């Protein structure tokens, strides 16, 4: 376990030896990060990239006592985050079919997530009020500029807790292989930088719902919980059938392993119709799961329940349009982007009234 950040510690002057100085420095380093993370051991271990068991040994060695009670969830503050350097990704768009790409550029604290049009330089904040459409993907628009299929990159930013970033892009995000796997690698390549300002999670304090589950309609709800989780139930024709999956956020590695690899999918009989409507023009055999004749046609599944996991990926992306990471339990029943955004509007209205 090695400290990675340096801080000014005047008490080092009191050290009688190099070993004693290192011990003093390490103790102050640990205290610095514990205070910065509201004495949350799990969050501190994640940032310092150490195990909880090893970290607790350090606490005992340095006689560091934890506060008797932690701050309530609604008062916990976390450092805002951006990237250390700009990174680039190239690919093709799923719906328009054109070659596209994006540039992720670090932004100062308080900037939020912003999409910037490469051609015009105009920007679109990744906010709920800028949602233009939810047909087969989530599309933002402000003025004459728009950007579509943002849900996969937004899900990745949400789960990696990146709060400030400029995404330079064209009309549509690249689909890559239909999952968020490449976006995870892109963010990690840019390296994360915690910033001096802080944010508080949006803590759900009551239940909200959208849709009528009793009538068999697509339905989604969110309720209070100590942790963030998403459960999804889907009912489709074969080969999908009935699938259920629950994802509980346990750091970005859990997202990278359990949700990010899940790919978008479509039925063969729908592809021709979608193309006529101006969608799926960029659909290729290597960027989505093609289904037909009650079987998967073009690939092997990465998970038995890959379809339900991908629906959760979409939810994670849509929910970051509230501007901050969320704490609550989401339950979805056959829902899509339209239901996700409908629920988000209810949550936002309540937050506005409360504030």
What annotation goes with each model-predicted range?
Residues 1-5:
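Conserved C-terminal helix/linker of AAA+ ATPases
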């Amino acid at each position: 376990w090695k400290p990675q950040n340096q801080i000014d510690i005047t008490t080092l002057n009191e050290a009688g030896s190099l070993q004693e100085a290192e011990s003093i420095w390490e103790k102050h380093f640990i205290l610095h990060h514990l205070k910065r993370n509201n004495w949350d051991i799990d969050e501190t271990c994640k940032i310092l990239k150490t195990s909880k068991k090893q970290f607790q040994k350090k606490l005992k060695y340095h006689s560091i006592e934890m506060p008797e009670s932690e701050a309530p969830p609604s008062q916990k503050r976390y450092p805002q985050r951006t990237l250390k350097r700009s990174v680039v990704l190239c690919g093709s768009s799923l719906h328009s079919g054109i070659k596209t790409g994006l540039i992720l550029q670090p932004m100062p604290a308080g900037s939020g997530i912003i999409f910037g049009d490469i051609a015009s330089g105009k920007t679109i904040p990744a906010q709920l009020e800028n949602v233009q459409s939810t047909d087969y993907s989530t599309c933002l628009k402000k003025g004459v500029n728009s950007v579509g299929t943002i849900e996969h990159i937004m899900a990745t930013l949400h789960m990696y807790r990146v709060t400030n970033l400029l995404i330079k892009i064209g009309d549509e995000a690249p689909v890559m292989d239909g999952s968020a796997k490449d976006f995870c690698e892109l963010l990690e390549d840019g390296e994360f930088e915690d910033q001096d300002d802080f944010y508080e999670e949006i803590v759900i304090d009551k239940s909200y719902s959208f849709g009528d589950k009793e009538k068999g309609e697509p339905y989604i709800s969110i309720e209070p919980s100590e942790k963030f989780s998403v459960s999804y139930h889907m009912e489709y024709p074969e080969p999908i059938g009935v699938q259920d999956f629950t994802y509980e956020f346990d750091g970005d590695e859990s997202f990278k392993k359990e949700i990010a690899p899940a790919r978008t999918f479509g039925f063969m009989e729908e592809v021709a119709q979608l193309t006529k409507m101006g969608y799926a023009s960029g659909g290729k055999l290597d960027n989505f799961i093609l289904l037909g004749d009650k079987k998967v046609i073009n690939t092997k599944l990465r998970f038995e329940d890959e379809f339900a996991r991908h629906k959760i990926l979409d939810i994670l992306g849509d929910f970051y349009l509230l501007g901050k990471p969320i704490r609550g339990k989401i339950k979805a029943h056959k829902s899509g982007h339209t239901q996700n955004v409908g629920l988000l509007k209810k949550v936002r209205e309540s937050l506005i009234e409360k504030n």
